[in-house]
Regions:
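Nucleic acid-binding interface residues in structured DNA/RNA-binding domains
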Residues: 3-6, 11, 15-138
C-alpha cells in the first residue's frame, strides 16, 4: 500500500542540520571539506535575516550558512531541495492568510527565471512582484 504524500508543512520538519566530512569531491567541493547539510527550518529562519529589499544569490546564501556553521561549504543539492520546500510552504501559508507577515522571504534568494522557480506550484512572476513591493517599501 503506498504511503500518503507528505504535506509541505510536514516536509518543513525534516532532520535537523548536521555536518559531514566529504570522503570524495562532490559538486565542486573538494574531498576533506566540512559540508553543512541544512534543513528547511534553518533555511526559513536564515531567509528571515536577509534585510527587506535585499537580494542574494543562492551561492552567497549557501556560503553564509556555511560560515555561520563553521563549515567549508553548504550542500548545494539539499539547499535547493529545502529552498523549494520553504517556497511551497510559504506559498500555502500566504494563500491561507493573504499576508506575507512572518513568512520566509524565499524571493530574496530564488530568481523568478531560475530552474527552481519553474518547478514551483505557482507562477514565478509572484517572486518578481514580491521583490518589487519590497523595493518600494525599503
Amino acid at each position: 500500500m503506498p504511503r500518503a504524500k507528505k504535506t509541505w508543512g510536514e516536509k518543513m520538519k525534516a532532520k535537523p542540520p548536521h555536518h559531514v566530512i566529504l570522503a570524495k569531491d562532490f559538486a565542486g567541493i573538494p574531498k576533506g571539506s566540512k559540508l553543512h547539510i541544512s534543513s528547511p527550518e534553518e533555511i526559513a529562519a536564515e531567509l528571515k535575516t536577509i534585510p527587506l529589499g535585499s537580494i542574494m544569490s543562492i551561492q552567497a546564501f549557501r556560503r553564509r550558512l556555511a560560515e555561520k556553521n563553521k563549515c567549508d561549504a553548504t550542500c548545494p543539492v539539499s539547499t535547493s531541495i529545502f529552498l523549494r520546500i520553504v517556497a511551497e510552504y510559504t506559498w500555502e501559508e500566504f494563500n491561507s492568510s493573504s499576508s506575507i507577515q512572518g513568512l520566509a522571504p524565499f524571493w530574496r534568494v530564488v530568481e523568478s527565471s531560475s530552474p527552481m522557480a519553474k518547478k514551483l506550484n505557482f507562477d514565478s512572476s509572484w517572486i518578481d512582484l514580491q521583490r518589487e513591493l519590497e523595493k518600494q517599501n525599503s
